[in-house]
UniProtKB/Swiss-Prot annotation:
Protein name: Large ribosomal subunit protein bL32
Chain spans, region Disordered: 1-23
A family per Pfam: Ribosomal_L32p
InterPro entries per UniProt: Ribosomal_bL32, Ribosomal_bL32_plant/cyanobact, Ribosomal_zn-bd
Family of this protein: Belongs to the bacterial ribosomal protein bL32 family.
Example of a GO MF term: structural constituent of ribosome
A GO biological process held by the record: translation
Source organism per UniProt: Parasynechococcus marenigrum (strain WH8102)
Amino acid sequence: MAVPKKKTSKAKRNQRSATWKGKAAVAAQRAMSIGKSVLSGRAQGFVYPVREADDEES
């Protein structure tokens, strides 16, 4: 069974954690930005389905 030979230092662990959290923060910011643009009607970079009104169905 594969096991690490030496214990990972706290500095290395913290550095990896900070990188991971930074990437997560960037992804969250992009998601919020896209969500805001969709809700405000300014989204132009992608296509998304729009619910049709009930009047058109009858």
